């Protein structure tokens, strides 16, 4: 009854107005799954490859080749298979592509089909996606890591770090955590406006003010937390995504906004000082993606008390993650479905992390759609943390709203991760 009888790929637009792939999978019993694929701005060199068309159309960013792969080769390969055989379906598509980074058919094509298959199978089983993927143990609502000030590749301002996040760790529920975040976000808007800064938002819905350095941004956030009536460190923790690969040049970290250059050890010490001066509990990509020595130094320096998340470092890839585990580098992995390109490999990455005592953070991309799959996957994997942007833009709100629905549906079984995500 769950045999795949039709697959339809199409080109739609993401939150930046760029093309992306959407896929519908239809089963023999009439069940259907639909998935839209996200896209990143600051992409790691080791990520699976999005297939783009090139040429003049959409300034080279069209995805008709990927759509053609969905409707052609991929449908021919998995048509007739049972949708609940997710691992077999994903493996078939990966082998059909035949490259180590999915560059022939495109990770955007393979992922679209992979996620749509899972959604169709969940529909056939009469289950929500989080329950279908995670089983009866899926019950933990993640702490949102809310990116309320944007910099780096996500904004047109001098701030070198890409994201400044608030984590409502002291909230009793996910729903309340979202409320706390919203109140701080709107308080920050007023503080920035009163200080003469613009309150335009970046790709992920956070503000992109013309601030010179990380401490200045952090001070604005700390003041906004207190003004909104919350206690920094106790109720609201802070997180950073440095996206350090973006400003790593010739072996050094070049801060254009601060007009400073730091070598890897100085970079690690700078991050350690920020973590000591502010209630920062999580730092993502504090060092560049191939600066393994710098990563090791940072991990030895503050890894016992601070979550150190590898995004560009690990790119949701179990092989790179295992390298990091073996070397004692970082202690957490950022999980982005389109970095690796299939649901099976995504779940493998989370499982590998958890088995090694590493945390996992489910994440959006800067180019998103109304698709809320990652909200379900965060609950399905009980990973306890999610990055899905700020408290504006409907492409970000779609994920928060889905989490609110899931928490309501779980009722008394629901547990908000809260302070359990904090190390040390």
Curated annotation (Swiss-Prot):
UniProt: (2R)-2-phosphoglycerate binding residues: 162, 336, 365-366, 387
Active site (record annotation): 204, 336
Pathway: Carbohydrate degradation; glycolysis; pyruvate from D-glyceraldehyde 3-phosphate: step 4/5
Gene Ontology CC annotations of this record: cell surface; extracellular region; phosphopyruvate hydratase complex
Reactions the enzyme catalyzes: (2R)-2-phosphoglycerate = phosphoenolpyruvate + H2O
Keywords for the protein's UniProt record, in alphabetical order: Cytoplasm, Glycolysis, Lyase, Magnesium, Metal-binding, Secreted
MF annotations from Gene Ontology: magnesium ion binding; phosphopyruvate hydratase activity
Record text on cofactor binding: Binds a second Mg(2+) ion via substrate during catalysis.
Gene3D superfamilies: Enolase-like C-terminal domain, Enolase-like, N-terminal domain
Cofactor(s) required for function per UniProt: Mg(2+)
CDD domains, A to Z: enolase
Residue numbers binding Mg(2+): 241, 284, 311
GO BP of this protein: glycolytic process
Domain of life, source organism: Bacteria
UniProt subcellular location: Cytoplasm; Secreted; Cell surface
Record function comment: Catalyzes the reversible conversion of 2-phosphoglycerate (2-PG) into phosphoenolpyruvate (PEP). It is essential for the degradation of carbohydrates via glycolysis.
Family per similarity comment: Belongs to the enolase family.
Protein name: Enolase
Organism whose genome encodes this protein: Mesorhizobium japonicum (strain LMG 29417 / CECT 9101 / MAFF 303099) (Mesorhizobium loti (strain MAFF 303099))
Gene: eno
